């Protein structure tokens, strides 16, 4: 089975190009013109964490339904399917307050998003732990 674009790019949330993320593959080595390509999955997951934290602080997004609607725009995604997938994976109702400041819950949420975006979740807990540690240095 071929790897998904997000897994190949070490960008499991398929973050569009634009921001100068830590760990970006530099021009000349980057073959994807639409999505960021990072040097390791930890850096792609780090970017996910930073985006989730920004959205929580800037837009007060504290529920799975709010978080997913913001990151999976209905014009290009099946937002309901993404919400349902993340709810099932986390075991948390879509409109319950989510503690994204808790590293355990954040890891569960990240794994659910990665699985939905890529059809698989290939990363071990160690990758998520390193990504969360890297996100602390933003």
Locate the predicted segments by residue.
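Cell-wall polysaccharide-cleaving catalytic domain and substrate-binding groove, primarily
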Residues: 1-138
